[in-house]
Curated annotation (Swiss-Prot):
Binding site residues for Zn(2+) 2: H27, C42, C43, C59
UniProt-listed SUPFAM superfamilies: HSP20-like chaperones
Taxonomy of the source species: Eukaryota, Metazoa, Chordata, Craniata, Vertebrata
Protein name, entry field: Cysteine and histidine-rich domain-containing protein 1
Positions of region (Interaction with PPP5C): 2-77
Amino acid sequence: MALLCYNRGCGQRFDPEANSDDACTYHPGVPVFHDALKGWSCCKRRTTDFSDFLSIVGCTKGRHNSEKPPEPVKPEVKTTEKKELSELKPKFQEHIIQAPKPVEAIKRPSPDEPMTNLELKISASLKQALDKLKLSSGSEEDKKEEDSDEIKIGTSCKNGGCSKTYQGLQSLEEVCVYHSGVPIFHEGMKYWSCCRRKTSDFNTFLAQEGCTRGKHVWTKKDAGKKVVPCRHDWHQTGGEVTISVYAKNSLPELSQVEANSTLLNVHIVFEGEKEFHQNVKLWGVIDVKRSYVTMTATKIEITMRKAEPMQWASLELPTTKKQEKQKDIAD
C-alpha cells in the first residue's frame, strides 16, 4: 500500500518496501516569507510568486517519511472563577487618547444670499489713461458728437456680431446680419444667447455669423452701450482665485462687480461705449469681505479669497442634467 510522504516539499506517495536513503528530495528547513519574497530557510532561492514557491525542488535527499508532523501545541489558558475582575486586568496603566474630530467641510451657502459690491481698486495707469482720453470727465465735444446725426466714414456698426463699417449712403440700405442676444461664456464654452452655437475657441466665436437680420446701427444714441465679448481667464493659489478680464480703459464709475459666497456678477463698461457682462456660479465658496477688484489700463483683475484653502476643480460649478433641461424648457 502506497503511503504519503510528509517531508516538506515532497508530498509524493511511496512504497515502504522500496524506500531508500535517496528516494526523497525535500526541504529540511522551514518556509520563509519576508518583504514579499518566499523561500526555504535551507536554500537561497527566493520568489515573489506563491505557485513558484510551491514548485521549488528540494535541496536535500533522504528517506521518505510517512509520519504526520505533530500539530503546533496551543498555549494552555488557565482560568479561575475565584479570581476577581480586577486581577484579570492588565498590570499597566491605560491611557485613552481621543482622536481629534475631523475638519468639517464648509456647507455650501444658498445662492439667494444678498449680493455685495466688491471694492474697486483703481491703478495709477488707468487714471492716467482716462485723463488722457478724457473719457471719465465726458467733455462737451463728446456730447455734441453723440447728439450729432452725422455718420463718419469707417464708423463700425453697433450691433453685436456685425463687423461692417459705414462706407457712405449705400451702407444705410444694407441688411445687417447680427446677434440680437448677448455673449455667454460658461464652463469653457462661448456662444450667443440668441442662437447657442457653442465653441471653445475665442476667435471662432468672434467669427460666428449673426442669426438675425435687420438694419445697421451707426450712432451711439441709437445703440446705447454695445455688449461685446472680452477675453478672460483665471488662475488660483492655495487661498485665492483670480479672474482676469482683458478690457482696456474701463470706466470705474459705470462698472461694478458684485458677489455673494457662491455667485459672481461682472458688469464692466470700457472704451466709452462697450459693455461686458458675465455671471458665474462659482465652483467653491468665497469670503466676500476679503475679495476685491483691481482695475488697470489694460485689464480688470477680480481677486476672490477662498473660504477654505482647497484646490478648485474649475472656476464654475457644472450644471446638472436636470438644471439643463429646466433651462432649455424656460428658453
